[in-house]
A protein has these predicted regions:
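Bacterial N-terminal signal peptides that target proteins for export
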Residues: 2-14
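Low-complexity, polar-biased intrinsically disordered regions enriched in Pro/Ser/Thr/Gly
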Residues: 1-3, 19, 27
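C-terminal partner/receptor-binding element of secreted or periplasmic proteins
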Residues: 109-157
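Mid-chain, structured segments of secreted extracytoplasmic proteins
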Residues: 73-121
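Bacterial N-terminal signal peptides
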Residues: 12-23
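N-terminal secretory signal peptides
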Residues: 27-93, 150-154
Length: 157
């Protein structure tokens, strides 16, 4: 059996240590300066529930000027999440309803039921959840700072 030379093992250990620091360093720095919380994509993340509805949990995460909003049901199931910055939205591929999130950049077909509720709103973002058949939800995320009626056509009322 052939063994690695001692210097080969030390080099491998140093590379592994540097890789670990590269991954963990930004996350620890974000938590130290108050920019990040843990748990995006988790059922019960380490973040405050900011939902305006008693029927939903909404968690907001901020990192590098980008706001991430996650919507969970009362059982902690992740339904959808998206990133928002300066009126631009990107739906994240997490949650059972991720394919049913409408944004100004990605409008969805009109749902059968349009009677939803606002589950989150701040100075930039508003989120409406609308129940549909078979326990699926449609969600609409819009920019609350939009003033152009044509550009804001997917706006939640």
């Amino acid at each position: 059996m052939r063994h690695l030379p001692t210097h080969g093992f030390k080099a491998l250990a140093a590379i592994a240590l540097l890789a670990g620091m590269a991954v963990c360093g930004p996350a620890m720095a974000a938590n130290q300066n108050g920019q990040g919380q843990n748990g995006l994509g988790q059922s019960w993340p380490n973040a405050q529930d900011v939902s305006s509805s008693p029927r939903w949990h909404v968690y907001v995460f901020n990192r590098n000027g980008i706001r991430y909003v996650q919507i969970n049901d009362l059982n902690g199931n992740v339904r959808a999440a998206f990133a928002a910055q300066s009126g631009n939205f990107l739906v994240l591929p997490i949650g059972t309803d991720a394919s049913r999130v409408a944004t100004p950049q990605d409008p969805q077909p009109a749902p059968a039921n349009t009677q939803g509720e606002i589950v989150y709103q701040d100075s930039d973002v508003k989120v409406q959840v609308t129940p549909q058949a078979n326990n699926v939800m449609t969600m609409q995320a819009v920019d609350t700072t939009c003033n152009d009626p044509v550009e804001c056509s997917s706006r939640v009322n």
